[in-house]
Amino acid sequence: MVVEDTQKSVITEDQYPSRVVSDNNNDDDDDDLEEGEIPVDGEDSGATATTKPPAALARNPHPLENSWTFWFDNPSSKSKQAAWGSSIRPIYTFATVEEFWSIYNNIHHPSKLGLGADFHCFKHKIEPKWEDPICANGGKWTMTFPRGKSDTSWLYTLLAMIGEQFDHGDEICGAVVNVRSRQDKIAIWTKNASNEAAQVSIGKQWKEFLDYNDTIGFIFHEDAKKLDRGAKNKYVV
């Protein structure tokens, strides 16, 4: 698989910073999360994972073509009255292969996140919101997975994006994994929804990278804003 050729081997296990987990008595602190902290659900409902790349990773870095930012939508801070996207926070921005693996190996993967969590990875300075000017005229491809079974597909999606494996990578804004009670969803957001050739190419390549056999659909953000769940797929592959 092409995305498995990424340079993970340049980082050895002893270079990863150890995961920092807080005590379980901090359930009320989710709204005060610092940059780099992600709450988890279940027995360790008050736990957080904090990531800061060690100084050792600054040696001989392998730069990525683009810088990327992880964002987290904290389910504990959401309310029905809050505006959509108001609880999304930037977690960490990375620009090298080493920084990516340092962060990825020290944050909770989708199967460990609480219900309702949304975890994003977007190109730096693009916010994962419909209102962002770069996203405004775009749309998204979406894949679905059984609850707790999206970890590997999420990783391969990230590797394909940051490794610039897509022929129309300039069209990609980022990706998000949504953790819900019945299923997990992974979506790739793009810039120009009306560019059918580029969107179809991205959808087909994404399925190939993940060896995903089900049909996937592309929805325009504009339709999603107007129709919510009633929005129809404009493209399918």
Swiss-Prot record:
Keywords: Cytoplasm, Disulfide bond, Host-virus interaction, Initiation factor, Nucleus, Plant defense, Protein biosynthesis, RNA-binding, Translation regulation. It is found in: Nucleus; Cytoplasm. Belongs to the eukaryotic initiation factor 4E family. It comes from the Eukaryota. This is Eukaryotic translation initiation factor 4E-1. EIF4F is a multi-subunit complex, the composition of which varies with external and internal environmental conditions. It is composed of at least EIF4A, EIF4E and EIF4G. EIF4E is also known to interact with other partners. In higher plants two isoforms of EIF4F have been identified, named isoform EIF4F and isoform EIF(iso)4F. Isoform EIF4F has subunits p220 and p26, whereas isoform EIF(iso)4F has subunits p82 and p28. (Microbial infection) Interacts with potyvirus viral genome-linked protein (VPg) in the nucleus; this interaction is possible in susceptible hosts but is impaired in resistant plants. Binds to soybean mosaic virus (SMV) VPg in the nucleus. Interacts with SMV nuclear inclusion protein A (NIa-Pro) and nuclear inclusion protein B (NIb) in the cytoplasm. It comes from Glycine max. Mostly expressed in roots, flowers, immature pods and mature seeds, and, to a lower extent, in stems and leaves. PROSITE patterns: IF4E (PS00813). Component of the protein complex eIF4F, which is involved in the recognition of the mRNA cap, ATP-dependent unwinding of 5'-terminal secondary structure and recruitment of mRNA to the ribosome. Recognizes and binds the 7-methylguanosine-containing mRNA cap during an early step in the initiation of protein synthesis and facilitates ribosome binding by inducing the unwinding of the mRNAs secondary structures. Key component of recessive resistance to potyviruses (e.g. (Microbial infection) Susceptibility host factor required for viral infection by recruiting viral RNAs to the host ribosomal complex via an interaction with viral genome-linked protein (VPg). Disulfide bonds join C135-C173. GO terms for biological process: defense response to virus; regulation of translation; response to virus; translational initiation. Signal peptide: none annotated. Residues 47-58 have a biased composition (Low complexity). Changing D170N: In strain: Zhongzuo 06-06. One of its GO terms (cellular component) is eukaryotic translation initiation factor 4F complex. GO terms for molecular function: RNA 7-methylguanosine cap binding; RNA binding; translation initiation factor activity. Its main location: nucleus.
